[in-house]
Structures are given as C-alpha cells and as structure tokens.
Amino acid sequence: MTYDILVSGCIALKGAQALALQHKDELVRRYGEAYIDKAIERRDPEIGIPADKGIRLIRQIAEGGINAALWQSAKELGCGLRVSLYDIPVYQDTIEICNTLDADPYTMDSDGQYIIYAENGLSTVEELKAAGFKDAALIGHTTQDKKRLIIYGEVERFLTPPERVQA
C-alpha cells in the first residue's frame, strides 16, 4: 500500500530562530530589527495531531530536519518516496536567514512539526488545518521501490542518509 506524505507546518523554525539569536546583529543590519524579531518570536501551535484511522506513521521533525525525518521514516516503513521540494512549507524569513548564514533549512531542527504518512492525505491536511496547523501540506507519497527521491521542477535527486545534524 502507498501512503501520502504530509508535513504539519513550516519546517526549520526552531533552527532558524537559534541562528537568528546567534547572529542577530548581522541579520538586523541586512533585514531590519522588526523583521528578525518577528522570525525569532514566531511559535508553532501547541496542539495535538488529530487522531485519524488512516494515519500509518507520525514522526517529529527534530535533529537532522525534514531530510532526516523522511529518510528514517522511509527506512522504518520499508518503502521509497517521492517528495516535492516546492510543496514543503518554509517561512520566507527562515529561507532568508538560512541563505544569509549558509545554512540548509531542510537539515535544520524543526521541533514541533511532524511528518505524517496517511492513506488520504488531502483529508488529513484538512483535519490538521481545522485543528490549527494552518500551514499543513501534502508534500509527496510513498512508493513500492526503495528510491527516496526529492523532486524540484524537472529535477529529481536522491535523498541522502542523514549525516551530522545542523542547528
């Protein structure tokens, strides 16, 4: 059986906040204090994932970021995956902080967010949004083969095993 792959919200928030605190002066000079303060003060919703009989697996996105969570969960399920990079939600300020500091948001701590494998991804996304996870998104699906692919546009690349974790 194949499953849809969802994310409960924007990734890399915790890691980007840690970087912003460490490099606040540099970032404020580039983006302004109000912009960086907003990025630092943003919080994930502190609510539970709704119970759904069609959910196969839920994994927190922590050390190693979404890439590590995808790798580990595919290994646990014994499946491959196809994930659209463009469908993974990331706040714009997180991208800018990461670009400025040469960090990768896809390998960054996203504590508070979850990867969810569900039979009916669209229905589960709607349940998540109704429960307060406004940025929940369907990002891909599992495959019968063992290939773990990240797709962006016409380009496909293999997901690599997690190495040393970042932020």
Language-model regions: role of each:
Residues 6-10, 109, 117, 140:
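Short beta-strand segments
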